[in-house]
Design a protein with these regions (language model features):
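Catalytic cores of Mg2+-dependent Asp-rich isoprenoid enzymes
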Residues: 1-152, 158-277
Length: 277
């Protein structure tokens, strides 16, 4: 899932996050980072990676049963668990672990629906945990959060498409290669692949914009944080487009993007306010 790269663009623990939330956010991040490293880093076999992830799953179960877990990153979630916040459920952590297990054994996806299913477990649970921290559990807010988080995950894929391909992972659905009449071979080195990346980016942008209504359920610094998170994703898409959708070029956010990010964040808030209640 490339957690570090994900938060490089979309830092959920930034200074805009209310101070009372930061320890919980940091604990969630450390857990996700550790599990992501288990799935992706080092030279362990897929079976060994899955065995370690299964052990983390047992620790999560112990944590939510009031027992002391063994893994430090799971133990670090104790304060969050003990806060008894509505919406902080064991299932969300198991969903994350199921996505990491999939990372350990799967490098390609046949369909977009399969990719979205992966996003629903690799990204959406984090958004739902963040909403639980601010006491937002409205069903519509959760749906909007899922759209934003899945869009951010997709944007991260298209930002890193060239790097992932060099590691044997191609997140562009194979059905889309067929639909565009191009081969997965040599992806993304062929110019014919640029139209394919454009299609993926357009789809991710539409999904992101479908979730801006979340902002109407939030307030204060956290609303601003999420508005800038949305803006970060949209800005990466703009940079991919500026590179003519050449996935061999990895765009990043820089300090000089702040004015554009501010504009995009403001635009997201205005778009959200125009939505029917």
């Amino acid at each position: 899932m490339a957690v570090d790269q994900h938060y490089e663009n979309f830092p959920v623990a930034s200074f805009l996050v209310p101070p009372s939330m930061r320890p919980f956010v940091a604990a969630i991040y450390r857990f996700a980072r550790h599990a992501d490293d288990v799935a992706d880093e080092g030279d362990a076999s897929p079976d060994e990676r899955i065995k370690t992830l299964d052990a983390l799953g047992l620790d999560i179960r112990s944590l939510f049963r009031g027992e002391r877990p063994l893994a430090p990153t799971v133990l670090g979630l104790s304060a969050l668990r003990n806060a008894n916040l509505p919406g902080v459920s064991e299932d969300l952590f198991h969903a994350l672990l199921s996505a990491f297990r999939q990372d350990a054994r799967t490098g390609r996806y046949e369909t977009f629906d399969q990719l979205l299913d992966y996003c629903s477990r690799s990204a959406d649970p984090v958004g739902r945990l963040m909403l639980a921290l601010v006491g937002v559990q409205h069903p519509q807010a959760l749906r909007h959060s899922d759209a934003i988080c899945s869009a951010l995950q997709l944007i991260n894929f298209w930002q890193d498409a060239g790097l992932d391909a060099s590691r044997g992972r191609v997140y562009v659905p194979l059905e889309d290669f067929a639909a565009h009449g191009v081969s997965v071979d040599r992806f993304p080195a062929s110019p014919e692949h640029q139209a394919l990346i454009r299609f993926q980016c357009e789809r991710a942008e539409a999904l992101m914009r479908s979730g801006v209504g979340l902002l109407t359920h939030l307030s204060g610094r956290f609303r601003l944080e999420i508005a800038f998170t949305i803006a970060g994703g949209l800005r990466i898409l703009e940079k991919i487009a500026a590179n003519d959708f050449d996935a061999r070029i990895r765009p990043t956010l820089r300090w000089y993007d702040l004015p554009r990010l501010t504009y995009l964040a403001t635009r997201a808030w205005l778009d959200a306010r125009r939505l029917p209640l």
